[in-house]
Structure formats: structure tokens, C-alpha cells
Amino acid sequence: MTHTRRKSLPMLSSGPTGRGEPLQMEDSNMEQGTEDVEPGMPESPGHLTGRRKNYPLRKRSLVPEKPKACKVLLTRLENVAGPRSADEADELPPDLPKPPSPTSSSEDAGLVQPRKRRLASLNAEALNNLLLEREETSSLAGARRSRGGDPHRSRDRATGSWSFSKKRPRLGDLGEGSRDLSPELAPDEGARRDGDPAPKRLASLNAAAFLKLSQERELPLRPSRAQAEADGRSTEPLAPRILRPKVNGKNCPKARQGAGSGEATGPPNWQEQPDERWPSAPPHGPPTQPSHQAPGKALENPLRPNLPLLMGGQAALKPEPGRPGEESPAPKQELHQPSFPAPQLSPLPMPGNPADYSGPCGGPELTALGSFYLYCGQDGLQCGAYSPCPMLPEGKLSPVAAPNEGLLMAPSSVPSGVPFQHPPWSAPRYCSSEDTGANGYSICGVLPLSLTHIGTTCGGCPYKMPFTAEGCRSLGQLEFPLPEAGHPASPAHPLLGCPVPSVPPAAEPIPHLQTPISEPQTVARACPQSAKPPSGSKSGLRTGSSCRHTVRSKAARRPSHPKQPRAQRPRPRRRRRRRTNGWVPVGAACEKAVYVLDEPEPAIRKSYQAVERHGETIRVRDTVLLKSGPRKTSTPYVAKISALWENPESGELMMSLLWYYRPEHLQGGRSPSMHEPLQNEVFASRHQDQNSVACIEEKCYVLTFAEYCRFCAMAKRRGEGLPSRKTALVPPSADYSTPPHRTVPEDTDPELVFLCRHVYDFRHGRILKNPQ
């Protein structure tokens, strides 16, 4: 209050009429009332000024402070948690003033406003009332009945203040407040509830929503039907609706198991009369129909662990972990739908098409599937959205169907004349919906199907689809080619095993990896292809060979005609020479462990020390040039021979080798980050492979940096016409000198001499500085 207002107060109170009315009007807006002021107090302007000075801006009251302060405190406690009846209010101590009667003046009722309870407190109270009421036992009910003999409580029950009924409240009852559920509430709280019922109604609705959410999880805590009948309660379900998963914005009931036998009851004569038609609308009749079950009934064992799979492009649902008192569900799983396009397949056995499931499928060679999920679209009984063999068993493939497997079926658009029969190999589990007239899914069926042969139903699926807990664990289950774990993805040609750049330049397409479809013998026998294919073609698609022996070797490996067994046909030695392009083994053969492709460990093979053709001898540990394409201009590959052996199946001479990588074969092209490579520089690697000796073009030499420098100096000396050195200044040592067959002859073409200074890690695509 401003200073001007204070100065005007004496002037207003000094008038002849109504001396105290303005002051009392102002005081009534901020104090409890003015009738408590003592009548003998002088009403002078000084007294009014002092009274304004002590107004409760500083929380100070008038002379009768103690009674008024205690009275306000007791009023608050009485409105929040006061006595249960009027008789208890009379039993208060005599030294304390009595609370104001409910028949006080309208002025006091308008002034005294009780403190509103917080919504959190109301929520907790309403929720506790609903939950604690469900946990009441017969002994607790008896205790409350015996406690009802109190005269005060009997009078309160007669007036309808609260009720001891254990019947669970409906939504309409909850809307009026939780007064009928909580005996702790005061009977005089009805007036306050009539004045402001919104918080309690909101709390009751919140409690009802919490009860809905916890209804399925708290099923073990629900009293049995026998106890309900003993307590005189109704056995009809009290929850009018059940939360349901939505498919494309439409409600669909969840499939549940029966309370007694584990299976829901079917329509009339489901198995006895298969020709009877499915009713167009689920019945809402009295409970005397033995074959139908209301969808709102709470069953004892719901299909909680495995919710139905929402088909039609919807993601799968994860089952919740087990809770105390429930049957432990299957491990936490997650099903994923495949992303590859669905092939056109024959229709699956559908309800209403008895010819499709006239009998069990045969063929025990495949593992039986547990069940399948069926989705009926809006175009009739056809597989919508997902057609390729929708056999989705829960967990791993097993011949025993899981108990919680289910089928989500939505034949809402099925005409009434289409019969919905029970397949002969499955037991029905289904439930019907309430709102069949709405545009939603009206029927949910659970058809556990045990198929022993997928091809019988699907007409031969081109894809394997074993869906497990982790979905598609690897691409190998979809029959996609993958390199084996023991053999890394090498830059070799996919069909021939020769190296190609793992990451080619930008203008060159990325080559394909070696596929398991190609046979190892064909890979080993064929000639290497070009490492840099022409523009517009992929190296992985090249199948042409550089020599004619490849076609002959492929024809030789084909299975012989049944009229001429292979053992009776003679095998001339000249044919082996053609197969090996003229290379023949030299020396005696011996058994030796050599590297063989697709073998985890070195295999014992009949080995040789050298091969010979037209007087040229190539030994083990020599370096050779291998053909890379049909054209002579194709750059050959460089490899070092580690073993020469004979293939026991075809008798062909094979060689195990280690690849040398050219600069254009490296990852990133011909410009590695370490240094600028020389013209004839190659990079050693630990990339092992096998190939036929028929791909050998000629012998070459790979030298160290010092040896290559000496070779270049000698070549320059010979080019200048200087005489070569005839005698050595230092006699060579037999232990440390290069063997004569590995020394570079003086008349060797410089194009056949290579320099190797570094090792290339083909797995990581980098050059090793310090190879170990």
C-alpha cells in the first residue's frame, strides 16, 4: 500500500456515516475477517494507522494472536485430513477452539479457502486404492467387516460417505473421485469436491490408465475366479477395453491362449463341420455361447512373451523379459524382415482354400519349421506385403514348435461367403474383436504350422530364409558368395587366382572377389587375366583365357560318359604335355607338404624339383612371368615358385607361388606415398596362391637394390662397348654367393629384371617399412 493511500485512510474513516465500513471491506480481502476484532477497541485514526502498520505484510496479527493462529492451523489440518465424523470433532481437547461449523455464514465460506492438494498426491492415493484393493484377501476383508461394527463408521456408511465394496470401480465411478475406495478420506470432503472436482477426477483417470497398463503384467496378483465367487463379486470382466497393437492405424486384438487347455475356443463346430462359414461379425451375445470368448476377458496365460508379428512392412515387436510369477519367456529376440526383393511364388495355404492344405506336407529331409505368420491384405485372401516363404519360426529352426508362436491374421475384407476352416495339421488359436464394423482387423488367428518341406508349399524358393534371434546372421544364409575365413579377399582374378588391384584407379571398375561357385581346380588351371581391363568392362566378368589349353583342361575335367568309364580310357603322356603347355617334370618325384588352395594346412603331394620346356629349366624358388591375358601386349604377372607338384585328381602339374605386386596393382595406383617407384620395381607379398604351370611364359629375375644397381652398371658398360670383366678381384665364396642358376646372365633382356625393395601388405593395402 502506497504512502498516499495510508494518508487517505483517516479521511475516509472520519465521516459521519459508515466509519468502519471501508476499512472492513479492505481488511476482509486480506485477513480472515473483521468480526474477530474486539468491540471495545477505540476506532481512532491513530489506531487505524497502527493497525495498518502491523498488517500481515510482516506476518503479524492483532492482539488475539494465539487463538487466531491456532485456529488457522487447525483449520488447515482439519480440511486436509480431519476427523472421519462429527463425533470425533467433538472429542477435541477443550483448550483448543472448535473448528467452524459447516453452517457458517456465506462470508466466512467465501473467505476461508482450503489448500488444494497436489495432483501427485491425488494420483498416488487413487492408484494405491486401486492396486491395494486387488491385493485384498479374505482375511483382510473379514477384518474390515469386523471393524465395521464401530457406531461412527456404521453411521458413515449409512450416510454414504465411503464404501467397503471390493468391486473394482468402473471408469464412470472413478470419474466422481476416489471417495468410495479410500476409507481415509474425510466425509465432509464432498463439499470441497463439488466445488473443484477436476484434480480428483484427473487423478482417478490416471489411476485407471495405470491399471490398464499394468493389467497384463499384474495377472498373477488377480484373485482367482473361485475367490471372486466366494466374495460375492461378479465374474464378468471389469476392464471394458484392452490395449491393442495398431497396424496401419487400426486396432487389432492380440491372440491369447485359453484359460484351461492353453488354446482358445473356436467357432461352433470348428473341427467337426469344416464347411460351416465364418460369422461375418464376432458375436456380442450372452456368455452362454460356449464357443466364443469375449475379447476383454483377462486370461490366465496371455501371449505376452511373443507379441504377434506386425506384417505388411511393419517392424517386429520385441518380447519383454520375464517377471516374477510369470512363466519365463523365450530369450529376447528381434526379427527382421529381409530387404531383398520378394520373388513371385505360389500362394501359401490360406484359410478358405482347403485344397492348399488338404494334407500334411511330406519330405523329412529339411528341418521342420515351428509356425508361420500370415498377413491377409485388403485384396482378398492373398499374401500381401510379404510373399516369399513367410516361414518365421521363433528362435532357431527346430522341429518342435514353440508354445508362444503366433499368427497375426487380418481377414477383415474377407467376404462372408468364404469359409474359414481349420487346417488338418494345426490347432487353432484365435480371438475376435469387438468393433468389427470399424475399418480394422477383425480376426486374429494363431496357426502353429509344422512344415517339413519348404519346397512343397512355396514352390521352390530361391533364397534360404532361416530367421533367428539375431535376424539374418550372415549373408551366407541368403546364398550370397563370401570369401572363406582362412583365405582373405585377395586381389587375384576371381576365376583364375592371379592378382588384380584390390582398389583400382578411379577409371577402373572394382573387380569382384573370388566366388565359391568356381571350382578350385578350374581356378588353378586357368591362365591369369589382365589386371587392368579395358574401359567399360569389369575384370570380374572376364572369362576368356590366353591359351588354348584352358579350354581343353576344362573339357577334360567334365564327367565322362557312362558308356566309357574313366578307368577304362587310356591316358596318353602326350595329353599331359598339352595340358601343361609343354612343361614336363624333371627329376624324381617325392612326397612333400605343399600349399594347396582351400586347404587349412599344407597337404602331402607328389612334388618335383623343376620343370623343363624346350631346354629351359625352371626350379623351385625361381621367379617367372605368368600370362595375364589373351593379348601379347598384356602386362604379365610376376610370381615366385614355392613348390611344383602334381594334382592327384587330374594329373596336371601345378605350382604353389607367392605373388609380386606391380605398382599399378597397389591400392591407390602407381603413386604410393612412400616414394616414386622405378620402372621395373615390384613389391613382395605374403599372398600365396596356386596355378597351373601352363601359364608360365618365361623365367625372370627379381633382384635386391644392390644387385639391381650392379646389373644396371654392367648393362651400361656393355652398351658403351667396354669389355666385360673376365676375372674377379675377390674369389667368390660357395656359402654366400648367389647360385649360378639365379645369377643374371649378361645377355639378359633388361625387361626381365625387376627390383624389389619393399613388402606390400595386401590385406590392409599398405607398404610395410620394416617387415618382420
Swiss-Prot record:
Q: Which domain of life is it from?
A: Eukaryota
Instruction: Name the segments for region: Disordered.
Output: 1-63, 77-117, 131-357, 521-582, 723-743
Compositional bias ranges of the Basic and acidic residues kind? 147-158, 170-182, 189-199
| Biological process, per Gene Ontology | heterochromatin formation; negative regulation of DNA-templated transcription
Provide the positions where the record notes the PTM Phosphoserine: S8, S101, S121, S182, S204
Where does this one sit in the cell? Nucleus; Chromosome
Q: Which cysteine pairs are covalently linked by disulfides here? A: none
Record-linked InterPro entries: BAH_dom, BAH_domain-containing, BAH_sf
The biased composition feature labelled Low complexity covers: 299-310
Q: Which UniProt keywords apply?
A: Chromatin regulator, Chromosome, Nucleus, Phosphoprotein, Repressor, Transcription, Transcription regulation, Ubl conjugation
Signal sequence region: none
UniProt modification remark: Ubiquitinated in a FBXO11-dependent manner; leading to degradation.
User: What name does this protein carry?
Assistant: Bromo adjacent homology domain-containing 1 protein
